[in-house]
Amino acid sequence: MEADEFIPLSEIADSIKCIKLQIDSGDVMGRIREIIIKKKYIYAVDISQQVIFVFNKEGLLVTKLNKKGRGPGEYSRIGPVFIDDDESYIEIVNYTGGKQSILRYKNLSFDYINTTLSYPDISANSVKRHKGLFYFAIQQIDNHINDKDTNGDLVICDSENNFKVLFDKKIK
């Protein structure tokens, strides 16, 4: 399959910058699931070590979030990661094998702030949050939403667990 139309990169970007992420000699980055680039910092979510590395815009390691455990303020397994617009806190979906929760930490010090006990139980390839809504890219992964089986491309969920399925394919 070929693209019908090409868009020159110059139409969507005026420059490109490659930043080499540098870690301390005692650290190793493993399987990076996601790189999140914000105004102040670059975040690398390492799912093999269950750690989030934080880099400055020059690529130097600033700190890392490493609170895997079973105690208060610790996570069992890192799920999706959300960082607020001013980068004052970082939130991690804590996959526990049961009801997922969202742990909130103060950014850079990673002091534990609180836990939200509500996170939709949806299987997805990617999750983003914007203005209180969760956007799940489920891309044909089977889910049961609104009392129906679905494998649509996108599911949107609000803070009261109201769901909307977009591009429902119903592929068997």
Regions found by a protein language model. Give the residues of each.
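Blade/loop signatures of beta-propeller domains
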Residues: 1-18
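Beta-propeller domains
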Residues: 9-10, 44-66
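Beta-propeller fold detector
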Residues: 16-20, 61-69, 112-119, 163-171
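Blade-loop segments of beta-propeller domains
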Residues: 22-27, 31, 60-96, 118-120
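Residue-level detector of Asp-centered blade-edge/turn motifs that repeat once per structural unit
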Residues: 37-39, 83-86, 129-131
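Conserved beta-strand positions in repeat-built beta-propeller and related beta-rich domains
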Residues: 44-48, 92-96, 136-139
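Short, solvent-exposed loop/turn segments at conserved positions within beta-propeller repeat blades
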Residues: 47-48, 95-99, 144-151
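Beta-propeller blade signature
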Residues: 101-108, 149-161
